[in-house]
Amino acid sequence: MRKITMRHSRTSILQRAALAFGLLTTSVVPTAVAPSEIEYYTFPSIYGGTIDTKQWQGKPYLVVNTASQCAFTKQYASLQKLYDKYREAGFGMVAVPSDDFNQEFDSDAEVKSFCELNYDIDMPMSETLSVRGQDAHQFFKAVKTESGFAPKWNFNKILIGVDGTVIDTWGSLTRPLSAKLTKAIEDELSKSQ
């Protein structure tokens, strides 16, 4: 049985409003899942070629749906810092630009240029993809099936653990360098040593 929990029984009005608009998500505690069900997916890379999550077999990785014209776009800088902080330990990340919320540029060339010029991004980034609904990329469909989570807005974060299962998800309001996100990554990295 899947269980959705809140870390605090009392939530502020701001938190409840953010939750209602999909900016904040609750923790998802998935049931045991065979690792192959979520573990390996490929994404078309915005730089050419593909990003294969198999390269992080036995290591945690974070998938974040992004947008270049969103109030949360400044999180790109923190995402790059997060990637830089843990990549030598084997941590992986995929930024997935999406126009599902009508806040992305019309072309991948514009997205790539914007991210490189404004945020000096070198983390793995896919081409613009759908992250929810019928047209969602297979990774997001698998996450929805296994954990019930689908992005409710831009900059939602999905941590895949060393065993290939969804460890946790976070909404837009969770900063990439937040204590809860970095602790979850560190916990998973300690399992992969």
What are these regions (language model features)?
Residues 41-60, 83-86:
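A short beta-strand-turn-helix
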Residues 4-18:
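Bacterial N-terminal signal peptides that target proteins for export
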Residues 72-136:
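Structural microenvironment flanking redox-active thiols in thiol-disulfide oxidoreductases
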Residues 59, 66-69, 97-100:
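Short pre-active-site segment immediately N-terminal to redox-active cysteine/selenocysteine motifs
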Residues 16-27:
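Bacterial N-terminal signal peptides
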Residues 141, 146-193:
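Thiol-/selenol-based redox modules, centered on thioredoxin-like
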